[in-house]
Amino acid sequence: MNQQNPEEEVSLVNNSGGGGIIEAPAIVEEKEEEGLQQKQEETIESTDPILVVVEEKLLEKSVDGEKEDDNSSSSNMEIDPVSPATVFCVKLKQPNSNLLHKMSVPELCRNFSAVAWCGKLNAIACASETCARIPSSKANTPFWIPIHILIPERPTECAVFNVVADSPRDSVQFIEWSPTSCPRALLIANFHGRITIWTQPTQGSANLVHDATSWQCEHEWRQDIAVVTKWLTGASPYRWLSSKPSSGTNAKSTFEEKFLSQSSESSARWPNFLCVCSVFSSGSVQIHWSQWPSNQGSTAPKWFSTKKGLLGAGPSGIMAADAIITDSGAMHVAGVPIVNPSTIVVWEVTPGPGNGLQATPKISTGSRVPPSLSSSSWTGFAPLAAYLFSWQEYLISEIKQGKKPSDQDSSDAISLSCSPVSNFSAYVSPEAAAQSAATTTWGSGVTAVAFDPTRGGSVIAVVIVEGQYMSPYDPDEGPSITGWRVQRWESSVQPVVLHQIFGNPTSNFGGQVPTQTVWVSRVDMSIPPTKDFKNHQVAAAGPSVDAPKEPDSGDEKANKVVFDPFDLPSDIRTLARIVYSAHGGEIAIAFLRGGVHIFSGPTFSPVENYQINVGSAIAAPAFSPTSCCSASVWHDAAKDCAMLKIIRVLPPALPRNQSKVDQSTWERAIAERFWWSLLVGVDWWDAVGCTQSAAEDGIVSLNSVIAVMDADFHSLPSTQHRQQYGPNLDRIKCRLLEGTNAQEVRAMVLDMQARLLLDMLGKGIESALVNPSALVFEPWRVDGETITGINPEAMAVDPALVSSIQAYVDAVLDLASHFITRLRRYASFCRTLASHAASAGTGSNRNNVTSPTQNASSPATPQVFPDKSLYLAVGQPTTTTTTTATTNSSGSSHVQAWMQGAIAKISSSNDGSNSTASPISGSPTFMPISINTGTFPGTPAVRLIGDCHFLHRLCQLLLFCFLQRSSRFPQRNADVSSQKLQTGATSKLEEVNSAKPTPALNRIEDAQGFRGAQLGTGVKGIDENSARTTKMGSGNAGQGYTYEEVRVLFHILMDLCKRTSGLAHPLPGSQVGSGNIQVRLHYIDGNYTVLPEVVEAALGPHMQNMPRPRGADAAGLLLRELELHPPSEEWHRRNLFGGPGSEPEDMILTDDVSKLSNSLDLPDTNFSGICDGYNRVHSLWPRKRRMSERDAAFGSNTSVGLGAYLGIMGSRRDVVTATWKTGLEGVWYKCIRCLRQTSAFASPGATKQPNPNERETWWTSRWVYCCPMCGGTWVRVV
């Protein structure tokens, strides 16, 4: 059942057209990671290198490019000159293990469309075909349906597993991810009644990784044909803005006030457990649920089920249905009886058999009595949930006593009763009603019904099909459809109006005024049938059949639906589907034959409509976590593969003349989606994708969206709120700015990465302390004697985590060392520049060399500094490629040459004499420069000196590091020899495995040796001297830090904090509405304006004793002077340099191709399967920089060789444990988003745990769900 080696292609569609064609494998340099994984029992893994092809098509209204008949009559709903905005299109192929045994019988096997998007994992599950096995094979089941699990952020990561099909005409009827509040699970319901629940492996230790591409079948059952099978979840505590229009007026309110539900909390609640409800076409309902609370991975959870409860919809059953848990915890089912297809009835499902009848369970209860309906064990839960858990508790106790009743017997004992609570009649066209008795079995009726998931059962959406069903004169012709009608109904409780003849109503009803549920139609719109209903053409891949009969006369015959006899619908009763977004803000209506209409808000404002060629099926889309995008899937029979397309919903595609009209409105709407994702806890990649796509189309500005989020962040009412959302906003902005060329923006991204690293390290250290409150809150306000008198035992670390915490100490020291080094170089540069500017006579005013603070809305142009054209909008074309832009007219050539030399000097590793110069000396006309204003925008860490929160947190953690180093001081005598041996071996291995050391490295090592000799003089005792100069830990590229270096780092930060503590640190002002919006940092506690002389005064006394950063490590990579940002979306078109391309078979070799790819670098890799004629087509990698970034992110091929840390998988530093790993032990997992890697987790199916330490297992289990730096999901490295 488990399958390997999916083959996949990615198509990035550019709506603006163009003739560029690029095609080549894009995942060449990931070959070692994307290779074949070892097959695990009952587990599906990510697999082979996957071919990624860039394809360009001018997107037409029909997604598969099939042109519609120009002669067909059009309607106002169909006239849409703007094609849907496509984020990307993916071609999904089955693995070779499937294709080897697949029989090609397209006229026999069914094609369909089933897709679901997981909000937590950002994973898309899709299926589109049923496959048949060749008769000679026994490898697979006779019929199967491949399920593709795709990560849209990195579509090269795709898992494929097979679901058993019962016939070649079987299909996936329902596919749905579990609610975000529940454990991750995928529900797959086949049309013939086979239901499977797929989950990530959970049996194992606490640090078992949650691999986004590893899935196993946890439970399976069979059931009758259903009209709906779905997850049940309690009412969400959140409400989207559309349901509370007045909330958006208060810009100063918190996001909780904007999005939290204003309804009163009910005492009855529905817990977060896996619960599936099925409503059958026969008119009954059944519940399956997983054991809750779960047994924490020790054994597989047990599943239970109830007996079918009869709805009472009549002998013919129901047409369509939906189920929901209301705000009060009750379960409601809305259904459409076949005997009255224009009426919607709402039933309430309650525990027990109903009518006071007592069920007689078939199971042998012995001395035990089945639980009553009001068990005291589950007080506070909704009655139905308490009833299910009471039976669960009882059945588990029976099993423990050795009694094992069959699933059928136990489910027969758990009965449900259903009673109608309300109903309303939907619209039926008078024309169809008048003719129904003579020409049809029944007239127009409801074909789809759905609850709004966020309104607790008080809002129902309805789709009505207007026309005639089966004609008695020619039943084979099928139904004719004259149109669709979409409605939105709201319910409210109103008092019953009684005639006076019945007396006083309050006296007859126990003093209570009788009430009734009243349904009112709020939206009622008509949608004409699409052109394919009027003149249906058989799909190109279908068999050759006779053309539809020419209509004799009139529109009535022309509108008939003519079915291909080999492509009949699964269920003629289901002609449409309704899909709500998770927050209810958007709704999609999918019609038979692939028409999709998307609406927004409670008034169902049209947003988008498009056509999917799925034949006689319904292409129900799936909304992304924030519903910024939608995903549709179909089967391309010509290419024999599934096609997945992601379409931008917010903002929709707009005509060019309208794209700028509502720019600020769209930017505000996108920002709201980001905040919603952070509050609810779902993935925000779709909002990033739609922002970048809309920015490319000119609808929004990337800088403006970030400015809106910054303004929202700074308007939060408290520091606690900003501490909560600050790191997540850093992650979002880093992801939005991915691939930006502007040097000041890239430096800012590195600053945000440094803040994220510090946040991760701080939380890790706090969780490892025996008493986390022992960390000194503001150490710079404490006098020196108090600091010296602090007992290191007060900050004791859990003994089981001592080895892990040492690696965190190393990372903090690395971060501080790089931060201070950049500040020292920058302060020296500012001082030299200011002195030269004064002596050159370029002006005596401070403003000549002072850039504006970050509070200013628009920058002033300096006279002797790089042109402010650097601050162009991200994503806009710019000709400025270096930091040494041309000076203005007042600058002379020798000043410009000097500036270039100064910038080159500061970028070099030799600091020169300026590094150690006293801050007091220098030109008498020294003009200070504000250090955090972007004066030299390309240098990282400069802005961080003005970040109060970063500076104070780093100082706090450095005190902990200093105490940790001091606590190990007395025992250094015993560890000196082993430490020397370790560092000596490291140095030798580095010399052997690395190229010749660079002069800069020699200078650094010489300086460190000289510094050690200086420290040795004047120190009492040889042993103490050796202890002070012995390096400990594996920081600074493995060479460690001496006691004196740790002390110096701590004292420098203390001095900086003291000197800046008295400065004002206001929150930056909003840039929203400004004409020149720049990308800026956001600040939790506000930002200082720190002068370079203050930095020099703090660094001056310690210049000779500061550690010199060396090599590439987890912290150092963040602040290197590389253009480093972790690569993530190599496939995204904004990083693909040539943009769109085409299919291999459609490729035309033109001069344009070579022009597009003339600047691409093709790695020396053998591209098997690519024709020689395409050799001119280069790789998708846009720049050589991306290759070097990836090497640096993995710690390989960097400027300083890492020697001993080079393993079979390359050099890596584990981002979870912060220790260097060789790749020889454990299983490596990488983050989908930033590609950081770790081997700290336990893998599914592992028989031996490498680390039996329970405390350390808990330590790493904090990050089994996602990367601590960027929040991306884990996938296995193969």
Curated annotation (Swiss-Prot):
It is found in: Nucleus. InterPro entries: MED16. Residues 1-10 have a biased composition (Acidic residues). One of its GO terms (cellular component) is mediator complex. Residues 1-21, 530-557, 839-861 are annotated as: Disordered. Disruption phenotype: Late flowering in long days. Very low expression of cold-responsive (COR) genes. The keyword Transcription regulation applies. Keywords: Jasmonic acid signaling pathway, Nucleus, Transcription, Transcription regulation. GO terms for biological process: abscisic acid-activated signaling pathway; auxin-activated signaling pathway; circadian regulation of gene expression; positive regulation of plant-type cell wall cellulose biosynthetic process; positive regulation of systemic acquired resistance; positive regulation of transcription by RNA polymerase II; regulation of cell wall pectin metabolic process; regulation of DNA-templated transcription. Residues 841-861 have a biased composition (Polar residues). Residues 547-557 have a biased composition (Basic and acidic residues). One of its GO terms (molecular function) is transcription coregulator activity. Induction: Not up- or down-regulated by cold. Belongs to the plant Mediator complex subunit 16 family. Component of the Mediator complex, a coactivator involved in the regulated transcription of nearly all RNA polymerase II-dependent genes. Mediator functions as a bridge to convey information from gene-specific regulatory proteins to the basal RNA polymerase II transcription machinery. The Mediator complex, having a compact conformation in its free form, is recruited to promoters by direct interactions with regulatory proteins and serves for the assembly of a functional preinitiation complex with RNA polymerase II and the general transcription factors. Component of the Mediator complex. This is Mediator of RNA polymerase II transcription subunit 16. It comes from Arabidopsis thaliana (Mouse-ear cress).
